[in-house]
């Protein structure tokens, strides 16, 4: 779940998720900090070469994430010249933006998308976005099968509706 956003991940391609909660907690990004302080998580995904996405592409991806249940989808673009561009930069320092870049393993020319919310929702949204990007960027070799044997799965899962483990 933490790496792929799903308990049935497609492991034929990368684009693993990463945690930037500790970095965001040190920032001025109050909305996300409040989410983290109330038991939420923040996970990101690095899209190689994504700095080339148009504003319309980013808006469409944001709408897709919202259709999956996200309240918002934040992004940081790391331009080819090494500069970062994002509305998020009003709330994070240049050092924090660089720390996020390093955590993601991002390079100049990449874009990072991230979501903060309750863990189950974040994993669902990011897992679905991961599959979307895998298909959109043609990263999935459909002729290849990559079986995965899950051995450490949770026996019970918390249900918000029931208010108990099920």
Regions found by a protein language model. Give the residues of each.
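Class II aminoacyl-tRNA synthetase catalytic cores and aaRS-like
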Residues: 1-166
């Amino acid at each position: 779940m933490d790496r792929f956003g799903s308990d049935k991940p497609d492991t034929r391609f990368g684009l693993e998720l990463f945690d930037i909660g500790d970095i965001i907690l040190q920032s001025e990004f109050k909305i996300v900090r409040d989410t983290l302080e109330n038991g939420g998580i923040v996970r990101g995904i690095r899209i190689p070469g994504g700095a080339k996405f148009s504003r319309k592409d980013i808006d469409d991806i944001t709408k897709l994430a919202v259709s999956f249940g996200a309240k918002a989808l934040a992004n940081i673009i790391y331009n080819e010249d090494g500069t970062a561009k994002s509305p998020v930069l009003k709330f994070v320092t240049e050092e924090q933006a660089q720390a996020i870049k390093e955590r993601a393993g991002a390079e100049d020319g990449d874009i990072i998308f991230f979501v903060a919310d309750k863990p189950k929702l974040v994993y669902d949204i990011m897992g679905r976005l991961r599959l979307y990007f895998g298909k959109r960027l043609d990263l999935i070799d459909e002729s290849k099968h990559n079986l995965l044997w899950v051995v450490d799965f949770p026996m019970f899962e918390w249900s918000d509706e029931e208010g108990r483990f099920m």
